[in-house]
């Protein structure tokens, strides 16, 4: 990694080529310690990144020794001062110093010295690029100032430009144009050199540079000295310290930019690559623009970048220069974040004719140039298009807001419509269920109306044979005997209709009188069933008594009611069963709202716990718990942040066995106080003084509620923003317009406790002035004077919550009713389960025996059972069988309603909420009885009592329907929740639909394969189209990758990395994908390099 810079010391002669050095024999390997030490020195000189250092450190000793020998073989032979001295010698008046002239100028002319200067610069560039970092730092230090010397020589090499401008004015242009080296050089100024401003930040030549030196400089500029100088600067900038030095130099970047006036397109391309890389470093864009401002002053341009555009238009024979120029223009315009500044820079080049020239280059054959042009066009910022997009966006946003409002309105309407349809379906399901019950009752009565039916009802229904009609005489005698004993009643209708009614009371208590029979018989069926039953017999038999005497009899003889309830089924008794529909007794109905029979439970206790220990003697102290007195301390003590237990909470705990007073007597508490007293203490006072002070202050301060509770009450009252009298008056009149529901719920927490009521009563008894109380205490005093305050607050909360709660419960009950009844009444579902049972028995009966049913969770197993080829499941096969053999069952899921909604309902919670509403309505009725002049309660009861009745009826129907359908499918309603039960059917229907779609897709694919085999195969797409598609995907993928717009120069090698990245892919901003997609003309995709291909 060293340099072969030895030629700088070789004498200049006709045969100046350095002699070849013989191969150095390999030295023996030193000891391990010395080897590691020398290897560490070599690594420090190589200036490698940490990952490479770690990799080389893992080498074995043989490889380490080889690396040490290689590095020592290429030792640095010339110090930086040798190169600096030679560069300074070329800057003398005659082009070389006297000392150097005496050594090697005697036999050489000036051109020979120019060739040697180029060789020196090449060796300097190699040294800067390959030597260790210490060599570069020595070249750039304050003593050598190598950067200043290099820039001065670069300015000297470019002096021929000014000389050419002067010679252009005095010499015929035709002779100049005939020179091959001047064919690509343009006039550097449109104005005479005298018009160029003198104040420019460049390297100025001293008066010592004579006219002869300028002519010599022209010869220098025709060589590669400028190009190699730029390479040297690039090598310096590749180091972090060197880059900082270059960026902070007042004229370095300016001289690099002025190198664009060189005649070589290769040099200009190198300069533009370096300037483009500097643009992408943080803070570099401003320095580049300042350098081109200086270029404008030096070269006399009317507009900035004018000469650059002239070179771009006329150097069309050198593709590398055009690619570098296009890349620089793209970066200098579009690498800034300020959009307005981007538009300004973009317009500068548009004004110079860039857009028109790019239109001419659109059909260029160079892929590299086309990619750079397309990258610029993708980054172009079209203000007109953005304005249109802004207007369109505003219109779209307004339209989107309107659509959102419409969606919200439609969603609300859809929810209301769904709830209405759910209610209607639930009502229709209830009517359908009632109609089926009535139909079953009519069928039973019709079967009983025949003699066969009458004789069949006396013994057990299933065991009596039909031929019993051959003995009618004995049967009639038996019936008459039972009727005489009061066990049955014969009801004769019109024609030959005869019905037999069992008297359960007589069967349960044979010795009872006949007056109990009608009472029990009317109590056994429900009210809805007793009315049509009483209307069916003809007038001669006495009808059963109405329900009102039944309720009266229940109130008169409450002890006898429980033993009369068990005989209701009547199935195990010898007498025949009654012809009434239904075999199971209905659940006991809730107590009616209008009756005053059983006393309702008292309202819940008011919130708030028992009083504190200090004032809570009496009822709050548990049995066996001794009251404790507060302890007076000599010093002020800090508070221990614990959660204390109340006396009522320690019963049966370990605390009942503890005696802390005994411990206090045994310990030295004075020492405890000395160690734990607070820092802010007054003088030590005795207990008597404290008691006297407390007794003096006590009369001046009265507290009715605890401090934290008073603070929370104050916050609540501020939220209500109402006075105490206004609040209490609204509570007394049930004014929900004044008191919001949220405020009521907050205020419920501050109902006076028993302890607070005792303090309030003591305060009023002593007739103390109100000024002693705080605002919160005065409110509590006024608040506690309200009659039946807990009942009123509960009633107010109920009045405010009832409409929303009822509106929330209704759809849930309807969903349960509709889903339960639709599942139970679906014949298609029953037939599908029948098919599933058949498949299961067919598969399992030989090993496990035949099954008579299955649990509903077994439906999930249909998806798990795979076929032999593992391509389909049992559910897919079931779908195929149903589609082929039972097409009428394919739409079975349309019979099942609201499964998902019913599955999300917690029936126990809903029933609990309904019962809570019922208790709240009863409380409201009692309040209205006590205060019948309240129009608010009267209007509420009138408007919402029907709603409550409907809720009660629907809750009972929902519970019965759900239990019925769960039991109907062999499940236990106590352990099966609606979420489990309905989710089984919901999952099955969804899986069935998905299986239907998959089977249909398989059919289409099979048909396509069949038709494909019949038709000739179509030729595949050519590989070229495939490659273009992959290139397009690669290009889109590249555009989606957000590269950083600005690089950091905080490491060595940053400039080389930036230049390499720009060569691999063009500079495209991440925010230009959409705009370029709209602007790009239709056609084949851009060719992408192999580095970007997928």
Curated annotation (Swiss-Prot):
Signal peptide: none annotated. Highly expressed in the spleen, lymph node and bone marrow cells. Keywords: Cell membrane, Cytoplasm, Cytoplasmic vesicle, Lipoprotein, Membrane, Myristate, Phosphoprotein. Belongs to the formin homology family. The modification Phosphoserine is found at residues 7, 184, 688, 1021. Residues 1-29, 173-199, 507-627, 1002-1094 are annotated as: Disordered. This is Formin-like protein 1. GO terms for cellular component: cytosol; phagocytic vesicle; plasma membrane. The DAD domain regulates activation via by an autoinhibitory interaction with the N-terminus. This autoinhibition is released upon competitive binding of an activated GTPase. The release of DAD allows the FH2 domain to then nucleate and elongate nonbranched actin filaments. It is found in: Cytoplasm; Cell membrane; Cytoplasmic vesicle, Phagosome. A lipid is attached at residue 2 (N-myristoyl glycine). Residues 1002-1017 have a biased composition (Basic and acidic residues). One of its GO terms (biological process) is actin filament severing. Myristoylation mediates membrane localization. GO terms for molecular function: actin filament binding; GTPase activating protein binding; profilin binding; small GTPase binding. It holds the Pfam family Drf_GBD. The gene is Fmnl1. Plays a role in the regulation of cell morphology and cytoskeletal organization. Required in the cortical actin filament dynamics and cell shape. May play a role in the control of cell motility and survival of macrophages. Its main location: cytoplasm. Interacts with RAC1, PFN1 and PFN2. Interacts (activated by RAC1) with SRGAP2 (via SH3 domain); regulates the actin filament severing activity of FMNL1. Residues 519-529 have a biased composition (Polar residues). Residues 1049-1082 form the DAD domain.
């Amino acid at each position: 990694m060293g340099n072969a810079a030895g030629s700088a010391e070789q004498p200049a002669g006709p045969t100046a080529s350095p002699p070849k050095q013989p191969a150095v024999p390999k030295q023996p390997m030193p000891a391990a310690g010395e080897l590691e030490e020398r290897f560490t020195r070599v690594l420090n000189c190589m200036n490698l990144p940490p990952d490479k250092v770690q990799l080389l450190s893992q080498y074995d000793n043989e490889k380490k020794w080889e690396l040490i020998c290689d590095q020592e073989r290429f030792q640095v032979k010339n110090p930086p001062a040798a190169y600096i001295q030679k560069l300074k010698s070329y800057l003398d008046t005659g082009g070389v110093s006297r000392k150097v002239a005496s050594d090697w100028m005697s036999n050489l002319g000036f051109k020979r010295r120019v060739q040697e200067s180029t060789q020196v610069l090449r060796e300097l560039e190699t040294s800067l690029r390959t030597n260790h970092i210490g060599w570069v730092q020595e070249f750039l230090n304050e003593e050598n100032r190598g950067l200043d010397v290099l820039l001065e020589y670069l300015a000297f090499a470019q002096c021929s430009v000014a000389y050419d401008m002067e010679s252009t004015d005095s010499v015929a242009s035709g002779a100049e144009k005939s020179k091959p080296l001047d064919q690509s050089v343009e006039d550097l100024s449109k104005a005479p050199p005298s018009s160029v401003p003198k104040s420019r930040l460049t390297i100025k030549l001293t008066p010592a540079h004579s006219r002869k030196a300028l002519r010599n400089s022209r010869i220098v500029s025709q060589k590669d000295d400028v190009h190699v100088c730029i390479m040297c600067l690039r090598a310096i900038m590749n180091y972090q310290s060197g880059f900082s030095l270059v960026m902070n130099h007042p004229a370095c970047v300016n001289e690099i930019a002025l190198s664009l006036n060189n005649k070589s397109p290769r040099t200009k391309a190198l300069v533009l690559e370096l300037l483009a890389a500097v643009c992408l470093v943080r803070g570099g864009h401003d320095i580049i623009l300042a350098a081109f401002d200086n270029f404008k002053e030096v070269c006399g341009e009317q507009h900035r970048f004018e000469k650059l555009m002239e070179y771009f238009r006329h150097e069309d024979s050198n593709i590398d220069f055009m690619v570098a120029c296009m890349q620089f223009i793209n970066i200098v315009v579009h690498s800034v974040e300020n959009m307005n500044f981007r538009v300004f820079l973009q317009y500068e080049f548009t004004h110079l004719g860039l857009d028109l020239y790019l239109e001419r280059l659109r059909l260029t054959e160079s892929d590299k140039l086309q990619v750079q042009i397309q990258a610029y066009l993708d980054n172009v910022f079209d203000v007109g298009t953005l304005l249109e997009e802004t207007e369109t966006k505003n219109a779209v946003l307004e339209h989107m807001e309107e659509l959102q409002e419409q969606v919200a309105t439609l969603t609300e309407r859809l929810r209301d419509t769904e709830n209405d349809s759910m209610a209607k379906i639930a009502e229709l399901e209830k009517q359908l269920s009632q109609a089926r019950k009535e139909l079953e009752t009519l069928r039973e009565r019709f079967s009983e109306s025949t003699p066969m039916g009458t004789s069949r009802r006396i013994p057990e229904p299933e065991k009596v044979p039909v031929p019993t009609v051959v003995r009618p005489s004995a049967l009639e005698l038996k019936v008459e005997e039972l009727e005489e004993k009061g066990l049955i009643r014969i009801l004769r209708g019109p024609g030959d209709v005869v019905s037999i009614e069992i008297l359960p009371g007589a069967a349960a208590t044979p010795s009872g009188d006949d007056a109990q029979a009608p009472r029990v018989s009317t109590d056994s069926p429900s009210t809805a069933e007793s009315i049509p039953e009483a209307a069916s017999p003809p007038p001669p038999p006495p009808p059963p008594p109405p329900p009102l005497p039944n309720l009266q009899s229940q109130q008169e003889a409450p002890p006898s009611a429980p033993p009369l309830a068990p005989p209701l089924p009547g199935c195990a008794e010898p007498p025949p069963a009654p012809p009434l529909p239904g075999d199971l007794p209905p659940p006991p109905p809730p107590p009616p709202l209008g009756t005053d029979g059983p006393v309702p439970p008292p309202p819940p206790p008011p919130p708030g716990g028992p009083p504190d220990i200090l004032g809570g003697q009496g009822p709050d102290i548990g049995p066996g718990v001794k009251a404790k007195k507060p302890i007076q301390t000599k010093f002020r003590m800090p508070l221990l942040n614990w959660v204390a237990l109340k006396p009522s909470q320690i019963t049966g705990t370990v605390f009942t066995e503890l005696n802390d007073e005994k411990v206090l007597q045994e310990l030295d508490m004075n020492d405890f106080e000395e160690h734990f007293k607070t820092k802010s203490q007054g003088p030590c006072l005795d207990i008597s003084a404290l008691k006297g002070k407390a007794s003096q202050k006590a009369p001046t301060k009265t507290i009715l509620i605890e401090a934290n509770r008073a603070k929370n009450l104050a916050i609540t009252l501020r939220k209500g923003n109402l006075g105490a009298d206004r609040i209490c008056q609204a509570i007394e009149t049930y004014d929900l317009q004044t008191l919001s529901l949220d405020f009521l719920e907050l205020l419920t927490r501050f109902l006076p406790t028993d302890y607070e009521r005792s303090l309030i009563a003591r305060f009023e008894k002593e007739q103390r002035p109100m000024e002693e109380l705080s605002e919160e205490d005065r409110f509590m005093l006024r608040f506690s004077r309200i009659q039946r305050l807990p009942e009123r607050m509960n009633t107010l909360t109920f009045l405010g919550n009832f409409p929303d709660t009822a509106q929330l419960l209704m759809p849930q009950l309807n969903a349960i009713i509709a889903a339960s009844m639709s599942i139970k009444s679906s014949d298609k579902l029953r037939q599908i389960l029948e098919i599933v049972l058949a498949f299961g028995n067919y598969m399992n009966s030989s090993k496990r025996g035949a099954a008579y049913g299955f649990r509903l969770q077994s439906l999930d197993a249909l998806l798990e059972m795979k076929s032999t080829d593992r391509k389909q499941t049992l559910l897919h096969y079931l779908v195929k069988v149903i589609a082929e053999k039972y097409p009428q069952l394919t739409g079975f899921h349309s019979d099942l309603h609201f499964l998902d909604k019913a599955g999300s309902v917690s029936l126990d919670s809903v029933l609990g909420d309904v019962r809570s509403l019922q208790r709240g309505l009863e409380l409201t009725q009692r309040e209205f009885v006590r205060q019948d002049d309240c129009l608010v309660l009267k209007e509420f009861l009138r408007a919402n009592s029907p709603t409550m009745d409907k809720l009660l009826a629907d809750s009972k129907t929902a519970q019965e329907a759900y239990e019925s359908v769960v039991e109907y499918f062999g499940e236990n309603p106590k352990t099966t929740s609606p979420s489990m039960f309905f989710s089984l059917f919901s999952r099955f229907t969804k899986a069935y639909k998905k299986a239907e779609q998959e089977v249909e897709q398989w059919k289409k694919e099979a048909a396509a394969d069949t038709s494909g085999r019949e038709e000739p195969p179509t030729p595949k797409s050519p590989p070229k189209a495939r490659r273009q598609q992959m290139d397009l995907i690669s290009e889109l993928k590249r555009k989606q990758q957000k590269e950083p717009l600005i690089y950091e120069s905080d490491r060595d090698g940053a400039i080389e990395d930036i230049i390499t990245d720009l060569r691999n892919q063009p500079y495209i901003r991440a925010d230009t994908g959409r705009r370029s997609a709209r602007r790009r003309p239709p056609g084949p995709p851009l060719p992408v390099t192999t580095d970007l291909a997928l």
